[in-house]
């Protein structure tokens, strides 16, 4: 998203992380009068860390109402932790939050470049003003729709990836490499 931000002339500012985790306090330190958007990938790629439900709610509460909080839920299917909730679950009817999802990860459709966003009508209307026509082709659309029907593939993929994550974590720990 950094490239798109620069195209439209936005200044991208990164906040410090603490132990590879996003910190609300560090984000808030970077907020200025000119801040328009705070963007969070939750869970984060590549660290795999995440912001808990309470942290995410706290961040939205502490941000100025005029600042849009964008939550990228690209990997939410892999989150089994009890203290995690997807952005969509937390902010379904909020005006100043926009949720992103992708078909690239769990559905394996990365090359089709298809996903979706959820937000208020005001945000959607603004996006339609800048959206190019024909930005997602019919084949990609049909693949996305069909992939939503295959619930067993999603379950199998989550299990496969989590099993491998445990194996990798165990191997790394055997070399005294700490993981999250």
List each model region and its residues.
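PLP-dependent aminotransferase class I/II
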Residues: 96-173, 177-178
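Short, structured coil segments at secondary-structure junctions
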Residues: 8-9, 93, 175
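Short glycine/serine/threonine/alanine-rich loop segments
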Residues: 10, 67, 177
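PLP-dependent aminotransferase-like
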Residues: 1-40
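Active-site pre-lysine segment of PLP-dependent enzymes
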Residues: 22-34, 46-69, 75-106
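Short beta-strands and strand-loop turn motifs
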Residues: 14-15, 37-43, 69-73, 180
């Amino acid at each position: 998203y950094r490239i798109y931000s620069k195209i439209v002339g936005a200044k991208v500012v990164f906040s410090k992380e603490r132990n590879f985790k996003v910190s609300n306090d560090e984000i808030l330190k970077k907020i200025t009068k000119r801040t328009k958007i705070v963007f969070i990938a939750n869970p984060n790629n590549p660290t795999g860390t995440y912001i808990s439900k309470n942290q995410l709610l706290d961040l939205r509460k502490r941000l100025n109402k005029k600042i849009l909080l964008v939550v990228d839920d690209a990997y939410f299917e892999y989150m089994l932790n009890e203290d995690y909730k997807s952005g969509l679950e937390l902010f379904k009817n909020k005006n100043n939050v926009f949720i992103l999802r992708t078909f690239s990860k769990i559905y394996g459709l990365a090359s089709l470049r298809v996903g979706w966003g959820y937000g208020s009508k005001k945000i959607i209307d603004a996006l339609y003003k800048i959206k190019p026509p024909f930005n997602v082709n019919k084949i990609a659309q049909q693949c996305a729709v069909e992939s939503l029907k295959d619930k067993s593939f999603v379950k199998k993929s989550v299990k496969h990836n989590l099993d491998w994550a445990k194996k990798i974590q165990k191997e790394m720990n055997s070399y005294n490499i700490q993981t999250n």
